[in-house]
Amino acid sequence: RQMCIRDSKETVDEVMRNCELLLIDLKSMDSTVHQTFCDVPNELILENIRRVAEADFPYYIRIPLIEGVNADEKNIKLSAEFLASLPRHPEIINLLPYHDIGKGKHAKLGSIYNPKGYKMQTPSEEVQQQCIQILTDYGLKATIGG
């Protein structure tokens, strides 16, 4: 079952009762940035990630890395601090460098791929490796892709 981690706590609890592992996207620790790019703030998302960790439930964190949006030292450090503070760490953190593979799919469906026209770029290999290093410095397991 697919659900959004910004659903109600009851929904999150129900999903945990019926699944073995959660894959959770964490796009930005800055609620304003999250609101700008995702149209919703991140407080409920962070609260539900904490809820999953406190339930001692296995989960992966997926962080899409977008140059100029969230692939920077400040956001990754804040993400690492938050995740390292939880009673159960994610099994792994998958850093997902931005790509535009979905552009063709959106065109076929008649939808707009980037409706707000943001400049979306893949971070350099160097930036990706710096992000991995920050996360591992906090005792977290991280990889590119996943």
What label would you give each PLM region?
Residues L22-I24, Y59-I61, E91-P97:
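Hydrophobic faces of well-ordered beta-strands that scaffold small-molecule active sites
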Residues S8-M16:
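Distinct, well-ordered alpha-helical segments
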Residues V33-T36, I49-S79:
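Conserved strand-turn element in the central/C-terminal portion of the radical SAM core barrel
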Residues E67-G146:
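Auxiliary Fe-S-binding modules of radical SAM enzymes
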Residues R6-K9, L22-V40, L65-G68, D100-G102:
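Conserved radical SAM core fold
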Residues M16-L22:
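Glycine-enriched alpha-helix->loop->beta-strand junction motifs that scaffold or abut catalytic
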Residues E14-V15, V52, L83, L135:
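Generic structural signal for hydrophobic
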Residues R1-I5:
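Short, small-residue-biased leader/transition segments that mark boundaries at the very start
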